[in-house]
Structures are given as structure tokens and as C-alpha cells.
């Protein structure tokens, strides 16, 4: 999994636009709701997500969360 995490973080770092994260499709870019409203996520796998805030063409407040534990 470490290689996948590094690759996804690199994609996030080099993205110029939020749309850049739509590919590959297995990123499953999502706009989050509820207590995480205003944040986005991409999937590492079925359990783990990279969650971030997008502004000024950059990802901010990046963190990795266990989706099943919040």
C-alpha cells in the first residue's frame, strides 16, 4: 500500500485543477457531506481515503483517514 499512497499524494501535489483527480477513475473523487462538508476525498482502497480541502488550485489540510472509523 505505501506505493499507492505515494502515487496518490503525488497526483494530488501535481494537480492543477480538481478535475485532474478524476483520472484514473479508481480515484473516485468525491465531494464530502455532513461533518466533512467542504472537503474532498480520493480513495486509496476500500478502507482508506485521502481527504483534503481544495482552494487556489491546490490541496490543503491533507490527511489520510480510515473511512470506516471516520
Each language-model region and where it sits:
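A charge-rich, low-complexity, intrinsically flexible signal that marks solvent-exposed coils, linkers
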Residues: 1-9, 13-25
Amino acid at each position: 500500500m505505501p506505493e499507492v499512497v505515494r502515487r496518490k499524494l503525488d497526483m494530488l501535489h501535481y494537480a492543477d485543477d480538481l478535475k485532474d483527480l478524476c483520472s484514473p477513475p479508481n480515484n473516485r473523487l468525491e465531494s464530502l457531506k455532513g461533518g466533512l462538508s467542504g472537503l474532498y476525498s480520493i480513495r486509496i482502497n476500500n478502507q482508506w481515503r485521502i481527504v483534503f480541502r481544495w482552494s487556489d488550485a491546490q490541496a490543503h489540510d491533507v490527511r489520510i483517514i480510515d473511512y470506516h472509523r471516520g
